[in-house]
Amino acid sequence: MSKREIKVGARFIGDGHPVFVVGEIGINHNGDVEIAKKIIAGAKHAGCDAVKFQKRTPEICTPKDQWNIERDTPWGRMTYIDYRHKVEFGEKEYSAIDKYCKEIGMIWFASCWDEEAV
């Protein structure tokens, strides 16, 4: 069997390398960079090698029949599409995440749910 490996940041992953642990943040930051930084710091403290966010375009990934359904959120009642927008990071927020992760030596990435999110 040939040796299979890839490089992520400064780390090699694959045959013969230590396990690569990813902390899933998803959208648990509630659209708040400071909360995201606290979660990243916790993942670093726990020994994670990387953290992963989720990125989606609400109009593409939220079924239209659910857009106007009101729900309880940490910010009170709002439509589902408004909630989906509130928890999404944009370029400005991801730039702050990138800067913070570089400062503490944490690899980060985001799984994109649609082409526009890429």
Name each model feature, range by range.
Residues 21-23, 51-53, 108-111:
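Hydrophobic faces of well-ordered beta-strands that scaffold small-molecule active sites
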Residues 47-48, 106:
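A structural motif
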Residues 1-22, 94:
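N-terminal amphipathic alpha-helix/helix-capping segment at the start of soluble metabolic enzymes
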Residues 49-88:
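Glycine-rich, proline-tolerant flexible connector loops at the mouths of alpha/beta enzymes
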Residues 24, 43:
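Conserved, mostly hydrophobic/aromatic
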Residues 44-45, 102:
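Non-catalytic positions within long, well-ordered alpha-helices that form the structural scaffold/packing
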Residues 26-28, 56-58, 113-115:
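Active-site beta-loop-alpha junctions enriched in small/polar residues
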Residues 74-118:
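Active-site beta->alpha loop and helix N-cap motifs at the rims of alpha/beta catalytic domains
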